[in-house]
């Protein structure tokens, strides 16, 4: 069996049902095949989604690549390319690694009972990654979302404190209004003082002229009383010739 990489092709994107025989039937029309092999998983024995074919001449290999690359085989679009040469004895494992890197290893996309992905290293269950582990979320009591809620709660508290600050500001203005009210009271008391002065009930006491008007005259009689016919003399009346009038 020839291992010459010059005549060896890499076949990727194979269906799970494609077998060695099916691979040979698809490519033997382009030339004599030395080998047709679907690579299997060493643990499960299932197809890994890629394989190799080896021709005995370069012309057949080139024709197969040109004709079959991008064609349909067993319901799958396959890729056909020249296999990489052996380096350091890596052999077919090196080609297999290249197939996995190019997305031809179907084990990654094979359903595993979850949303896809490998096994979680936290709980050991398949179908999710460690960062999406449901056991981790339940242990944290909601995970990162609960901390997010707490952050918004603290934000609400901050705005509540802001409202309190504005409430205190309103109280300050209320106190200012009280100050002006007391000022108005002061002016009111001042007005009362002047009102008392005008109304006769002030600190200056009763009107002197009123006392004189309501008191006795110098002649001993009350003004307006019987016998009080004489005019009371005003304090500033000047004597005229012939006496007071």
UniProtKB/Swiss-Prot annotation:
Record keywords: Acetylation, Cytoplasm, DNA-binding, Metal-binding, Nucleus, RNA-binding, Stress response, Zinc, Zinc-finger
CC per GO annotation: cytoplasm; cytosol; nucleus
Gene deletion effect: No visible phenotype under normal growth conditions, but germination of mutant seeds is strongly delayed under low temperature conditions.
Renumbered zinc finger spans (CCHC-type): 120-135
N-acetylserine carried by residues: 2
Upregulation: By cold stress.
Organism: Arabidopsis thaliana
Protein name according to UniProt: Glycine-rich RNA-binding protein RZ1A
Function: Binds RNA and DNA sequences with a preference to single-stranded nucleic acids. Displays strong affinity to poly(G) and poly(U) sequences. May be involved in tolerance to cold stress.
Keyword set includes Transferase: no
Record-linked Gene3D superfamilies: 3.30.70.330, Zinc finger, CCHC-type
């Amino acid at each position: 069996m020839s291992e010459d990489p010059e005549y060896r092709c890499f076949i990727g994107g194979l269906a799970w049902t494609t077998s060695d025989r099916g691979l040979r039937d698809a490519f033997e029309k382009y030339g004599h095949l030395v080998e047709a092999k679907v690579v299997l998983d060493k643990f499960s024995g299932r197809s890994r989604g890629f394989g190799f074919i080896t021709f005995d001449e370069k012309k057949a290999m080139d024709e197969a690549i040109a004709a079959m690359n991008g064609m349909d085989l067993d319901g799958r679009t396959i890729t056909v390319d020249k296999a990489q040469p052996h380096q350091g004895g890596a052999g077919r494992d090196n080609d297999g690694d290249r197939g996995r890197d190019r997305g031809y290893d179907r084990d990654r996309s094979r359903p595993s009972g979850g949303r896809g992905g490998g096994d979680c290293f936290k709980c050991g269950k398949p179908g999710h990654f460690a960062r999406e582990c449901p056991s981790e979320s339940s242990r944290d009591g909601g995970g990162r979302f609960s901390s997010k809620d707490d952050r918004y709660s603290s934000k609400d508290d901050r705005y509540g404190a802001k409202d309190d600050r504005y409430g205190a500001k309103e109280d300050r203005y209320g106190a200012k209004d009280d100050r002006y009210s007391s000022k108005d009271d002061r002016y009111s008391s001042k007005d009362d003082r002047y009102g008392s002065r005008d109304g006769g009930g002030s600190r200056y006491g009763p009107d002197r002229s009123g006392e004189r008007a309501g008191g006795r005259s110098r002649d001993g009689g009350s003004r307006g009383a019987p016998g009080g016919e004489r005019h009371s003399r005003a304090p500033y009346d000047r004597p005229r010739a012939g006496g007071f009038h």
